[in-house]
Amino acid sequence: MNTVKVGSVIIGEDYIPIQTMLKNPVKDVETSLYKINNLQKIGCDIIRITVPDEESAFYLKEVVKQSPIPIVADIHFDYKLAIKAIEAGVHKVRINPGNIGSEERVKRVIDCLKEYQIPVRIGINGGSLPAHLKEKYNFDTIKIMVE
């Protein structure tokens, strides 16, 4: 069986880890840590946090440092934020290659993930697919996502 280690949590074995996502801005470190600690107490294993801008990436480091459970950085649009999140010590990154930008940008994120030995979740959705591919494949989103 294939497994993926996210911090101290192993995904892919008999136990199914519970993950949730914070709704508050990560720059509110005190609230973030309060919620993370409470979520851990009721059984949450992994927390996902949106990193929408540079300021969030800056505060993410402190949240990761103090969190009792692994942190996943959810990145949209800016590949540099993914790199900053990895450098901040997150335990996993979620990216959507459809909105990160060019193949070169995706490669830079992947290279950084490899360097830090951090797993990635590739999350693709129809909303981020390029219009020219939608037309080329007659809106067959599965074929488009594979390309």
Spans of model-derived segments:
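Glycine-enriched alpha-helix->loop->beta-strand junction motifs that scaffold or abut catalytic
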Residues: G43, Q66-I69, I86-V93, K114-Q117
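Short, acidic/polar
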Residues: V26-N38, F77-I83, M145
